[in-house]
Amino acid sequence: MRKILLTSILILSMNNITFANNEYSNSEYQNLLNNYIGEMRNETDIFGGSIYKALYKGLDEGYIIPNVNRIEILSDSCKGIADNMKDIKIKDNNIQVKHNELVNKYYEVHQALEVLLQSRKEVIYTNKSTANKLIKLIVIDHTTGYRANKKIEELNNIYKDINKSLN
């Protein structure tokens, strides 16, 4: 009976140790983060051009027959990566703070892209003339598109800062 009790306590304590130690080390976190970013880049790489590049340099989808699929894919991808990363715990508190900031920024980028997407869809699906649509889409890209680009730039800076801290 005594051996069974000691064995049970030992097994329970070993399980508690393994479950309590679910925080990532810096190198494990760096590998995980780079895997998520790599998967996102693969998802958003359409026709050989990165959407990040397209958004950073300006939305280049054309104004006469604009395509919102690229923005939808990037928006969904940002939300997906934020959802996957939100519960990650890291042993280093400074990296944890930066990680939380990164996840929050992904949600902000997702929201900015959703606003851009909705405003572009409203213009595209109206019955106005092509010239009016063109003017409205240019205005949207210079306001809402610019805000989305700034959020993406901030997101990239946080990612670079985390990678510098991990090396």
Regions found by a protein language model. Name each.
Residues 1-22:
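Classical Sec-dependent N-terminal signal peptides that target proteins to the secretory pathway
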Residues 15-18, 80, 105, 116, ...:
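Generic hydrophobic/packing signal
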Residues 72-106, 120-122, 158, 163-166:
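Short, solvent-exposed, charged loop/turn and helix-capping segments
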Residues 22-68, 111-167:
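C-terminal amphipathic alpha-helix
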